[in-house]
Each structure stands twice: as structure tokens, then as C-alpha cells.
Regions:
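Dinucleotide-binding Rossmann-like beta1-alpha1 core, especially the glycine-rich loop
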Residues: 1-76
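Mid-domain catalytic core of redox enzymes
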Residues: 176-295, 327, 331
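Active-site/ligand-binding neighborhood in enzyme catalytic cores
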Residues: 62-184, 194, 201
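Glycine/Thr-rich phosphate-binding loops of Rossmann-like dinucleotide-binding domains
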Residues: 57, 208-209, 347
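Conserved flavin/dinucleotide-binding core of flavoenzymes
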Residues: 50-52, 262-368
Length: 368
């Protein structure tokens, strides 16, 4: 049971790729999977992902509207987008926006898409051209160039296998609360232990409770850090109907869940004999009672086993977040403290991006 989602590995960065595989036996420890994602439409039809390549499978009237949208998009080609909504409308047109992109993404982010800055989703946005969408629909081409179109997943142990393997031969003090980060007489201390430098990977919102007085002179950032927004995730472990999919996206407004992660298909070792499991995701907190009501409406007959709510899973940026974090980094780094990680940097990192950020920090700032 992946309590905060099913994490998979792939990357386009060669340095991350080489570093990662220096610790693992790719053939023996992992399953390589071809991403087979689908979208469960409101009428129960299952459409392959990404939807823009499979419009020909939809109702003829929708196809006709999509063609008109493409003609309009040609007229307005080159017009820049200022937010996520404008990007989606300008890239895919009104029909697909209203049918899939808006309802799905609203369930994920729980806000008007016009209020989502593009910088927040950098590296995660679909970027097909008009030519590609037209050609793929005419020739029924299966696109394999989107994010994580193929990926690696551990044979056993899930994400914990990665952590346990990477932790070998490293001295780690487990089950210890970091309660005090202090600089005194030019020296850094964590829980009284003297350090050369500190790499802060925790949630940035905790930094003031961990630092004694204002020895790092960052109190001016307090209000802005307190106002940083985020989403949590309620992950529901279920037995589901046997299926061939990796992820199933759920734009239907009849229920609150936005996605089923078919973790039972990532590795057969994730399943008990004769059973298929998956994780049904809901944004933010949802009670067990409401979970069960929703499951009755969700396709693939999910049967509740257990669930977990994690308060912090997705950092949310506004147009000023990166500038604020950068200014804070400059201040802290002058004192020997470095921010690193999804919630330390308030960046929507995938696993490989977090690894890349760590490598960049080491190469550019620490190894000097």
C-alpha cells in the first residue's frame, strides 16, 4: 500500500540515470513497464491516454467540435498563455477542455485553473503540436513521448526498497525529532551536534519551530512562508477489477476521486494471490464514510481495504513563490543552511527531479 501514491522511476537526465542505476540491478530488482494509462469518461467509455490522440474514439459530435476547435487554434497560433486555463484552451481547444482537462484538473487542484501559474507545472505539461494531434488521430498513432511513458518499479518492496537500498553504508540516525537548528559562535548545531553545513529537506513551514530565536535572520519571511499553499491526499487502498492499466484518470464530476493508481499492475508482488489492488486518490481529507459512498460510483468496482490521509503532498505556488524561496535560499546559504526537496523548496518535484536537484546542489554549491 503506497500511502502517498505509487512512485515510479524514469528520467531524461543522464547524470540522474547513471547515478541511480549504480545502486541497483536493473534487470533483477526492477520491472520495466510501458505506461498504459486510460481515462474513464462520464458515459463509462474507456479512452486511452492522452485523450488528444484518441478523439476519433469519442462521439461523432464531439469529433466535429474538436475539428472546429483545431481550425480556431490555427488562427490564434502563437498567442501566449498566462495561466493553466489559457494554456489548455490554447493547446487543446474548448471541447477537450470542458470534457476532460477542466473537470479532471479541478478535482486535482481544487481551484480555478486560471489561478494556476504555468511556472508551477514546469516540465509536467503536455506539449503536442496541432500537426501531431491531427496526424495521431488520422493514423491512430500511439504516442510514447509523454512523461513516464515507460518506467521502472521495484519487483518487491515498492518505494521503501529504494530508500532501504540507498541508505546502505550511510550513517543515519532514525526515529529522532529535529528540534533545534542553531548557529552559535560561527558554528552550526543540529540537536546539539556540531555540523559543517545543514541540508534542510523538511517542510519549510517547520523551519521556525526548529531554529532557535532568529539566529539565521529569516523572521521577515515568516508571514510569506505561513501563507504558502498546499494540498494533501487521501489514498485509499482497494481491491479492484482486474485490468491492464497503470493509471486510470477520472474526470467525472459524479464522484470526488481524480485517479486510480493500479499499483497491483506495477509488480505482481503487490497483489495477494488471485486479487488485484490499486490506490484510489482524493485531493485533501475525506472521511471513511464519504470514501465508501464515492467508491460505489467509481469504475472498476473498488472495494475498500484501508486508507491514509497525508496533509502535505502537493506544494502550490503562486506567481511570487519562486522569487521568495530564492531570496530565502540566499539568506540561509550565507549561514551554511541549504534547502532541498519538494516541500523545502516548495517545488512540485517528481522523484527524478528531486534527485537532480540534490545533484545540482552538490555540484554547484557544496563540492567547492
Amino acid at each position: 500500500f503506497h500511502r502517498t501514491g505509487g512512485h515510479v522511476f524514469n528520467t531524461k537526465r543522464k547524470d540522474v540515470w547513471d547515478w541511480f542505476w549504480s545502486f541497483f540491478d536493473k534487470e533483477g530488482d526492477f520491472v520495466k513497464s510501458k505506461r498504459n494509462s486510460s481515462i474513464s469518461m462520464n458515459n463509462g467509455q474507456i479512452i486511452p491516454y492522452p485523450i488528444e490522440n484518441y478523439v476519433y474514439m469519442l462521439d461523432p459530435e464531439i469529433c466535429k467540435k474538436f475539428i472546429l476547435d483545431l481550425i480556431d487554434l490555427i488562427k490564434y497560433a502563437g498567442k501566449g498563455a498566462n495561466n493553466f486555463e489559457e494554456f489548455l484552451l490554447g493547446r487543446f481547444g474548448k471541447t477537450l477542455y470542458e470534457l476532460y482537462f477542466q473537470p479532471y484538473n479541478y478535482k486535482v487542484w481544487r481551484r480555478e485553473l486560471s489561478n494556476v501559474p504555468l511556472s508551477w507545472l514546469e516540465g509536467k505539461l503536455p506539449m503536442p503540436t496541432l500537426k501531431e494531434m491531427i496526424y495521431n488521430n488520422m493514423k491512430h498513432i500511439e504516442e510514447r513521448d509523454f512523461v513516464h511513458s515507460s518506467f521502472y518499479y521495484p519487483q518487491t518492496g515498492g518505494s521503501q526498497f529504494l530508500a532501504d537500498t540507498l541508505a546502505k553504508n550511510i550513517k543515519i540516525q532514525y526515529n529522532t525529532k529535529v528540534s533545534n537548528i542553531l548557529k552559535k559562535d560561527g558554528k552550526l548545531f543540529v540537536n546539539g551536534i556540531e555540523c559543517d553545513r545543514v541540508i534542510f529537506c523538511a517542510n519549510l513551514k517547520y523551519i521556525f519551530s526548529m531554529t532557535e530565536t532568529d539566529c539565521f535572520d529569516i523572521l521577515s519571511f515568516y508571514d510569506r512562508i505561513e501563507k504558502l499553499e498546499f494540498h494533501g491526499t487521501t489514498s485509499v487502498f482497494c481491491e479492484i477489477d482486474k485490468n491492464p492499466y497503470s493509471w486510470i484518470y477520472l474526470p467525472d464530476k459524479a464522484y470526488e476521486s481524480h485517479r486510480i493508481i493500479c499499483t497491483g499492475n506495477f509488480s505482481l508482488n503487490n497483489n495477494a494471490m488471485g486479487r488485484t489492488t490499486g490506490t484510489v486518490e482524493f485531493t485533501d481529507f475525506i472521511s471513511e464514510e464519504n470514501i465508501c459512498k464515492n467508491l460505489e460510483l467509481i469504475p472498476f468496482s473498488p472495494q475498500y481495504l484501508t486508507h491514509h490521509y497525508e496533509k502535505y503532498t502537493y506544494p502550490i505556488q503562486d506567481s511570487d513563490t519562486r522569487d521568495m524561496i530564492q531570496a530565502l535560499k540566499i539568506k540561509l546559504e550565507s549561514e551554511g543552511v541549504y534547502l532541498l526537496g519538494r516541500f523545502a523548496e516548495w517545488e512540485y518535484y517528481n522523484m527524478d527531479a528531486a534527485m537532480g536537484a540534490a545533484m545540482d546542489l552538490y555540484n554547484l554549491k557544496l563540492n567547492r
